């Protein structure tokens, strides 16, 4: 065995894996997020010590599971323009050179909309276009450019970071999955995923409920209005006044309202991206998406050659639920 390091991306179901799936695995040790962040993100680039990181993670590294989406870099700062994303990959390689790297990717337009909604949930006030392109209007020497960078489209050009991990670990140790395949059949995907990595997990006891549900349109506007009364918790925002404690209160109110289902349906990508912006973004990501497709096709060929679990079938088990039986392709 070797350590499994699930690095994200953001908005690809990592919260569900952290809360519901990995903690139920019986033959591996799931490392808490705080420990993972301390091991790989606390030290500066010139002060990182792989031996210290291994000590923080604990003994028997080969049976560990790590899952932390910020290993790909911060969502609202583009991984510090990709610099942190790239450096963390090197940190993982120096600390756990035999690790199996897991990367989930998502359609970039869907990921962008989900990222903006998460920004609003986290205290953001700006609209989608301002969130995406707000820094484009700054001059090259504007003082704001010396502060924390904002969102960057390149963060979701995921093939670049995948290729970097391929170069560091070898593509056989880097496993890439589409979030859309995961969402299409949670139980089936989880069964095949567990079989792929030899994970001992009883799927009958897993909580399959969604995490971080999307906002409805009324709640989106309400959230942006409430966020004007707190400075927390994102850097790139406006506020009228900072009311102590309001951030926590407003988050609880928003979660309860969203969970009630009384404020309309959750917003989808098509509700928030007009045709012109969608076309602009598709063009931006077109080259990277072609390379990503080729990378996934290569992985599928290698899986077929090696007899890896690729798909699953559902079988009746005597009650309303369905048990999962991994299907091996030889």
Where are these regions (language model features)?
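Anion-recognition interface
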Residues: 1-330
């Amino acid at each position: 065995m070797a350590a499994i390091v699930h690095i994200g991306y953001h908005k690809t179901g990592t919260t569900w894996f952290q809360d519901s799936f990995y903690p139920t695995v019986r033959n591996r040790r799931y490392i808490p997020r705080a420990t993972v962040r301390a091991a790989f993100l606390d030290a500066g680039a010139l002060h990182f010590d792989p031996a210290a990181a291994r000590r923080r993670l604990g003994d028997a590294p080969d049976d560990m599971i790590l899952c932390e989406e910020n290993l790909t870099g911060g969502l609202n700062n583009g991984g510090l323009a990709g610099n942190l994303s790239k450096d963390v990959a090197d940190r993982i390689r120096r600390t756990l050179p035999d690790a199996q790297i897991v990367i989930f990717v998502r359609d970039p337009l869907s990921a962008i909309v989900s990222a903006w909604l998460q920004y609003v949930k986290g205290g953001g006030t700006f609209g989608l276009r301002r969130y995406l392109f707000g820094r484009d209007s700054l001059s090259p020497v504007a003082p704001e450019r010396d502060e924390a960078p904002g969102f960057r489209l390149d963060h979701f050009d995921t093939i670049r970071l995948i290729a970097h991990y391929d170069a560091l670990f070898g593509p056989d140790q880097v496993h890439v999955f589409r979030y859309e395949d995961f969402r299409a059949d949670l139980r089936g995907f989880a069964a095949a995923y567990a079989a792929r990595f030899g994970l001992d997990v009883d799927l009958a006891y897993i909580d399959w409920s969604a995490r971080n549900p999307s906002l409805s349109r009324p709640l989106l506007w309400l959230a942006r209005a409430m966020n004007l009364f707190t400075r927390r918790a994102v850097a790139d925002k406006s506020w009228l006044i900072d009311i102590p404690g309001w951030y926590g209160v407003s988050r609880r109110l928003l979660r309860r309202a969203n969970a009630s289902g009384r404020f309309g349906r959750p917003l989808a990508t098509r509700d928030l991206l007009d045709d012109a912006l969608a076309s602009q973004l598709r063009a931006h990501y077109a080259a990277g998406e072609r390379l990503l497709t080729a990378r996934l096709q290569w992985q599928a060929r290698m899986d077929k050659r090696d007899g890896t679990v690729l798909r699953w079938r559902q079988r009746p088990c005597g009650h309303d639920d369905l048990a999962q039986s991994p299907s091996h392709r030889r």
